[in-house]
């Protein structure tokens, strides 16, 4: 099932018992964020949350944790809620191969029902804003998609980027935005500022789950998130034209903000509790001026809690990081079997591969660090053999404990790039990277004194299936 907007997704969650409606009166702070934080502390299957009785807000409707469990993630892909995580990733990979799927242009988007322009804009009136963590420097929009175009190639649909970036609400029509240098919007801004220009952008709030997943997925520079969204949802993705910028935006969004990143202008932004589980601190960041707002009547506001894992962002970013890394590595190294980059947006990746020759696994690890995502995120790689499942942590721990000799199996790479939000980097944005080779050596590599590894007995698979069926029949 493909969801054209947030509302149809929420209805599907409700139908599956995965939307918890909280009718009692709550405070915007700290209740909304604390409840979302709590969903990551109550075990598997946490629901999405719905609030419509918020003290101090008139008729505000807020939803959080919409993709904050593997059940909800499965529903977002149109899969049964009990679909195992590995099968969800396998399905993600299968659908990826359908790229590109041309989007469907639609008229009369619901977000065109109401508009506000120029100095009449007051974001504090339109959006029910609240802080997510006690140390945040202000109100943040953190689950929105930002649309930008390459200023030197404006008509190239593939170079129109859709990405998720945090934005601090700093005034009635002013935002602070952090363009991470490794992301496409940073390149768009660089090109605009070289020409002495502002960079037009459109900001979409309250989106369907698939474009949200795509906004968190590291695609190549000329790959369209809308075309990949169509592949992932297995039907053309619906888009409409934003009235001020003329950009392509999701047809089903709740709110559209249009304006510009003001060229060569920076102001202090932050601090903000980030996906790393740490506050990022305050830094000089870009300034956004909002010139037009379009919104549905009674819009639904969606926000994302970030903090110590696991929270919703880990479910959102995990598969969306594993799959592109796998696809990019598999295209160059067919021996690669699987990639687990579920942890902190891929700052750690576990990769299983066959080996053609000695040192091969390390070469794969190096390539992972130089993919578009790896340049800014993949800080540590654990390489394992093809018979080790990267998603089975006991197997990974076995490989680490039995196959690694620290004297020669740790490859340290000094002064490499990483996103500035990595709290371990020093200075911010520079770090040493590490490859841990937990594979069995092949010629001419002569590490260790390995004998033949113990394999499962040939009959084990059949017995596993038989025992599983017997247990199921006993219930």
Descriptions of predicted regions:
Residues 1-272, 277-287, 291-475:
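Extended, highly charged
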């Amino acid at each position: 099932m493909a969801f054209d907007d947030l509302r149809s997704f929420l209805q599907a969650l409700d139908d599956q018992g995965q939307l918890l409606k909280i009718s009692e009166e709550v405070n915007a702070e700290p209740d909304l964020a604390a409840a979302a934080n709590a969903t990551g502390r109550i075990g598997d299957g946490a629901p999405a949350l719905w609030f419509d009785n918020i003290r101090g807000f008139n008729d505000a409707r807020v939803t959080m944790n919409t993709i904050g469990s593997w059940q909800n993630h499965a529903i977002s892909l149109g899969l049964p809620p009990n679909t195992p995580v590995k099968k969800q990733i396998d399905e993600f990979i299968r659908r990826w191969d359908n790229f590109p799927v041309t989007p469907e242009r639609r008229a009369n988007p619901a977000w065109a029902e109401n508009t506000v322009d120029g100095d009449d804009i007051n974001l504090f009136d339109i959006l029910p804003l609240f802080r997510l963590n006690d140390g945040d420097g202000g109100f943040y929009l953190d689950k929105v998609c930002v649309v930008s175009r390459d200023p030197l190639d404006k008509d190239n649909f593939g170079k129109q980027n859709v990405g998720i970036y945090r934005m601090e609400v700093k005034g009635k029509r002013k935002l602070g935005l952090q363009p991470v240098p490794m992301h496409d919007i940073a390149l768009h801004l660089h090109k605009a500022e070289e020409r002495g220009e502002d960079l037009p952008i459109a900001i979409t709030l309250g989106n369907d789950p698939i474009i949200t997943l795509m906004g968190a997925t590291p695609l190549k520079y000329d790959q369209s998130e809308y075309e990949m969204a169509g592949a992932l949802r297995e039907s053309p993705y619906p888009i409409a034209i934003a009235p001020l910028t003329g950009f392509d935006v999701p047809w089903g969004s709740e709110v559209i903000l249009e304006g510009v990143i003001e060229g060569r202008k920076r102001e202090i932004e932050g601090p903000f509790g980030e996906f790393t589980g740490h506050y990022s601190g305050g830094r000089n960041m870009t300034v956004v001026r909002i010139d037009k707002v379009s919104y549905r009547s009674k819009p639904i506001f969606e926000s994302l809690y970030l903090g110590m894992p696991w929270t919703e962002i880990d479910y959102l970013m995990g598969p969306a990081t594993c799959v592109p890394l796998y696809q990019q590595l598999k295209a160059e190294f067919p021996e690669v079997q699987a990639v687990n980059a579920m942890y902190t947006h891929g700052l750690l990746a576990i990769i299983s591969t066959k080996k053609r020759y000695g040192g091969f696994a390390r070469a794969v690890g190096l390539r992972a660090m130089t993919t578009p995502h790896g340049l800014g995120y993949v800080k540590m790689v654990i390489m394992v053999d093809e018979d080790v499942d990267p998603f089975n942590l006991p197997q990974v721990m076995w490989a680490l404990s039995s196959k690694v000799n620290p004297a020669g199996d740790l490859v340290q790479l000094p002064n490499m790039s990483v996103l500035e939000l990595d709290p371990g980097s020093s200075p911010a944005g520079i770090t040493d990277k590490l490859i841990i080779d937990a594979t069995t050596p092949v010629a001419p590599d002569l590490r260790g004194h390995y004998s033949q590894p113990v394999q499962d007995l040939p009959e084990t698979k059949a017995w596993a299936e038989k025992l599983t069926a017997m247990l199921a029949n006993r219930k």
